[in-house]
Design a protein with these regions (language model features):
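Active-site palm subdomain of RNA-directed nucleic acid polymerases
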Residues: 19-47
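Conserved structured core elements
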Residues: 5, 9-20, 41-44, 68-71, ...
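Residue-identity detector for threonine
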Residues: 12-13, 33-36, 47, 67, ...
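Common nucleic-acid-contacting/processivity interface regions adjacent to the catalytic cores
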Residues: 1-25, 44, 53-55, 108-121, ...
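C-terminal polymerase-core module
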Residues: 51-178
């Protein structure tokens, strides 16, 4: 008696609108900045996340730097360019939707140099910086894969974790040897 399907659909639809709105705005901004046309820089979207590829931008501007330098460049771009752009974009959405006030907030979570998606909510990310904290050594973030499921035997989980290190940091030959 407290559940109304119309309210649930309204909440779901407004969430989808807001995340797609920002994905489109980010794609348009990066296409304009990099002088590309209809290139999709958004790798994936989730209910509350946008996974964005800055590879082309980083290679164009900071391609001569090492990985640490590239991560620092991405961190600066996220803080100085993307965050204000996202805030402004959500303000535009609030005005477009005639909202009472703008309540959408999106912050950068991780910066990575490598990632693998197998399906929705199933991925591996080689994280160098998480919410502004720079790691001395990258940490592997795993979501939804067998290596983080409790139903997978511990021995298998450990071997899968080890294989990830080879996949992310080794060569194809190293993986075949493993």
């Amino acid at each position: 008696r407290y559940f109304d399907i119309r309210m649930a659909e309204g909440i779901t639809t407004s969430g989808q609108l807001s995340i797609r709105w920002m994905a489109n705005k980010l794609n348009n901004m990066l296409n304009k900045t990099l002088k590309t046309q209809d290139k999709d820089f958004v790798i994936a979207i989730d209910t509350d996340s946008i996974y964005l590829s800055l590879e082309e931008l980083v290679e164009k501007v900071a391609g001569d730097k090492d990985t640490v330098g590239k991560i620092k460049y991405m961190d600066r771009i996220c803080e100085e360019v993307l965050q204000p752009f996202i805030d402004q974009g959500y303000q535009e959405l609030a005005e477009y939707m005639n909202a009472y006030s703008q309540k959408m907030i999106m912050k950068r979570e991780v910066l990575a140099d490598k990632a693998i998606w197998t399906a929705k909510k199933r991925y591996v990310i080689n994280v160098h910086n998480s919410e502004g904290v720079q790691f001395a050594k990258p940490k592997v973030k795993v979501m939804g894969l067998e290596m983080v499921k409790s139903s997978t035997p511990a021995v298998i989980r450990d071997k899968l974790h080890d294989s990830l290190q080879v996949i992310l940091h080794g060569s194809e030959k190293d993986l075949h040897k493993y």
